[in-house]
Amino acid sequence: YHPVDRDASYDQFAYLRQCEGDRLLAEVAYLSDVVRDQQLTGRLAIFGMYDAGGALALLNLLQNRLADTELVGEFGTSLFSLARETKDNHEIEEMRAAGRLTGVVVGEVWEFLQGHSVRGDALVRADGELLTIGDVKAFTRSRVFAHGMNEEHHIFAQGRDAGVPHNAGTLDMPMRLGQSIIFDIFPRVESGYFHDMTRTWCLGYAPDDVLAAWEQCKTIFDRLLADMAVGQPCRDFQAMTLDYFEALGHPTARTNPGSYDGYVHSLGHGVGLDIHEEPRLSIAAGNATLLQPGHVVSVEPGLYYPERGYGVRVEDTVAFREDGKMVNLTQFPYDLVIPMPRR
């Protein structure tokens, strides 16, 4: 094969005229010519991002035109996802910078909350209105963008909402003292890399049950980070977490599949140019992956009890450098309680 100037060699408007404005047929004609001109025969692998229905229609028609070429694809781990599974030290440094900036934003949100007055059990804005989840999320987005990052969304969920792992938070809910808040933020820096971290906070004070659950999560979190090393099966860390929580009497996805209570998800996932990449810290069947140099993964044990009105999670993103050394890319303290001075 040889590189070509697509616009000079393949006039897209000419294909549209030839196909009387039918964009699907024009695309098929164009790709057929590319395959012919590049003399691509045999098995031809297809990769990329495309609407599933559109891809099916396109590739079915294209295959019918290619007598000497078989179009093939991969499901699950593909050539490109495998290549992206490990990062070199330069990429890890880019991701360390993403972690540093994310920590700065999280610190600014902490200070934003702490800077508000308290009326009864609620936070109050300068205009006298109650501070809401929506206000906090708007401030968070503004700081993400101010530091040159982008995000599609983040989780800032309080009380019962925090007890549902992927609940993003109810925008009009007032910020109240003594309720658990799960703040899960995963912005993307200009170089394209994501960072993923979660902190659990309580404004003013933490109720006993929230504190106990948080301490349990932090205990297993610390053990995991102390034990994780290159060469170990990724599934072992999820098994270790399940064993720990089950021994404390919590339901888990292993003992109570489908339960909304207890520890209900896997331990973590790869992070990189996508927020969810390989490897997976999961006991799912077929997961035989070993931790390798270059792996970057989230570690995020959590406990969730929506009917009791709380959830807690601790999450950092860690990387294994080319020499096998683990480095924590998340740079922010783990304090549970945000002190709220009375004004």
Task: Set out the residue ranges of the language-model regions.
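Active-site neighborhoods and metal-handling regions in enzymes and metal-associated proteins
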Residues: 1-343
